[in-house]
């Protein structure tokens, strides 16, 4: 009987201490609680053609691929038509200032053009007024993914 009392008392004290620790916010350290551990993922992976050649642009492309999109890259907007002839794309990403060349290249395609405007040049406002969806060149990967997801979802 003597042996059971200290064991029970120890169990009660341990449960009280553990309960207090969780109440103080330590629950954030439990896996899956409070902190996101997984990488961004594309719920609707799409086929994307992107005009990109700088290191920053190619880094964004890598992140879109890591999220699950199938991305093809061309260095110049004049190469879009050739790529569209070989593959079917859902979305074309290119700078807003290249919109006339992109429009000429995508005329016979079902691919949706999402312009990427340069920040602080006035392009952002113009692109937002002219297109249903647009991006800024320094938007986060999360913003790119959300915009692409909304475009793919709208297409059905």
What do these predicted ranges mean?
Residues 1-9:
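Bacterial N-terminal signal peptides that target proteins for export
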Residues 18-20:
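N-terminal signal peptide c-region/cleavage motif recognized by signal peptidases
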Residues 22-31:
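Cleaved targeting-peptide boundary
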Residues 43-77:
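Short, charged N-terminal beta->alpha structural module
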Residues 50-55, 75, 93-98, 116-120, ...:
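Structural motif
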Residues 65-87, 94-103:
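A short, well-structured beta->alpha microelement
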Residues 100-123:
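A short, gly/pro- and small-residue-rich
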Residues 116-152:
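Output/docking surface of receiver
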């Amino acid at each position: 009987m003597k042996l059971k009392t200290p064991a029970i008392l120890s169990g009660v004290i341990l449960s009280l201490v553990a309960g207090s620790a969780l109440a103080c916010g330590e629950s954030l350290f439990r896996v899956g609680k409070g902190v996101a551990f997984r990488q961004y993922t594309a719920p609707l992976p799409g086929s994307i053609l992107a005009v990109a050649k700088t290191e920053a642009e190619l880094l964004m492309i890598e992140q879109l691929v890591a999220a699950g999109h199938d991305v093809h890259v061309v260095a110049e907007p004049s190469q879009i038509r050739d790529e569209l002839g070989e593959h079917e794309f859902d979305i074309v990403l290119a700078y807003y200032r290249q919109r006339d060349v992109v429009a000429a290249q995508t005329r016979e395609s079902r691919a949706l053009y999402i312009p990427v405007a340069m920040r602080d040049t006035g392009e952002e406002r113009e692109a937002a007024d002219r297109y249903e969806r647009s991006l800024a060149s320094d938007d986060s990967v999360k913003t790119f993914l959300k915009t692409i997801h909304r475009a793919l979802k709208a297409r059905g």
